[in-house]
Design a protein with these regions (language model features):
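Amphipathic alpha-helix face/heptad-repeat signature
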Residues: 7-10, 41, 45, 143
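Active-site activation/catalytic loop segments of kinase-like enzymes and analogous catalytic loops
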Residues: 99-133, 144-169
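Conserved ATP-binding subdomain of kinase catalytic cores across diverse folds
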Residues: 1-26
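An alpha-helical support segment within catalytic cores of ATP-dependent transferases
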Residues: 18-75, 186
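Active-site acidic catalytic loop and adjacent metal/ATP-binding pocket
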Residues: 54-104
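Short acidic/histidine-centered micro-motifs embedded in hydrophobic/aromatic stretches
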Residues: 62, 142-143
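ATP/Mg2+ or Mg2+-diphosphate-binding catalytic cores
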Residues: 19-22, 151-188
Length: 188
């Protein structure tokens, strides 16, 4: 219940946050490039938030009667910088390790490296080697689908890059999880 409440609370917060940005930019007579880009793509952001809320409700229906939750030791800050490759690969820098759901590190890794790696093969390999329940997969997909929070500053160039990254993140995540929601995949 607390995971559901936290997710829904954050989704409501991020929805209000971006709605306020949209409202403020609508009053500008000549919108800047980042404001114009944001206005033109706001419906995509809104659709993503609606999808996340719907999936949160579906996930909660799946787990509301469960009394046990699976936990494991998580690294806490997985990124490419913390992987040493040799004949075997090693994960270093365990300073932030903690016990959490098995998907916590996968979520962090996606948030840290979404723009640097093609994750479809990584997920396929991960799901084949590590057994995740349907509930855990759904929770993972919800968490990575939540839009990133963009902070704006004084530099228009950087603001435009941040808005572009926001919508690139949404698009790339949509392409990544889409096959797992296809009719063919649901039948298997």
């Amino acid at each position: 219940k607390s995971i559901y409440d936290n997710l829904m609370g954050y989704l409501n917060y991020i929805e209000d946050y971006y709605f306020q940005i949209l409202k403020e930019s609508e009053y500008v007579e000549y919108p800047s490039p980042h404001e114009s880009l944001f206005q033109n793509n706001y419906t995509k952001l809104r659709e993503d938030i609606i999808f996340c809320k719907k999936e949160c409700d579906n996930w909660y229906k799946m787990v509301q009667d469960k009394t046990k939750e699976r936990v494991c030791l998580n690294h806490g800050n997985v990124s490419l910088k913390h992987i040493i490759r040799n004949s075997k690969s090693y994960l270093i820098s365990w300073d932030k390790n903690h016990f959490d759901t098995p998907i916590a590190d996968l979520i962090d890794f996606y948030h840290n490296e979404w723009n640097n790696l093609e994750f479809s093969g990584i997920l396929e390999t991960y799901f084949s080697k590590c057994s995740l329940s349907d509930e855990e997969k759904k929770l993972f997909f919800i968490n990575i689908s939540i839009p990133l929070k963009v902070e704006f500053g004084e530099n228009e160039y950087i603001n435009t890059i941040r808005v572009t990254d926001l919508f690139d993140y949404i698009h790339k995540t949509e392409l990544l999880i889409g096959p797992y929601y296809s009719i063919k995949n649901k039948e298997q």
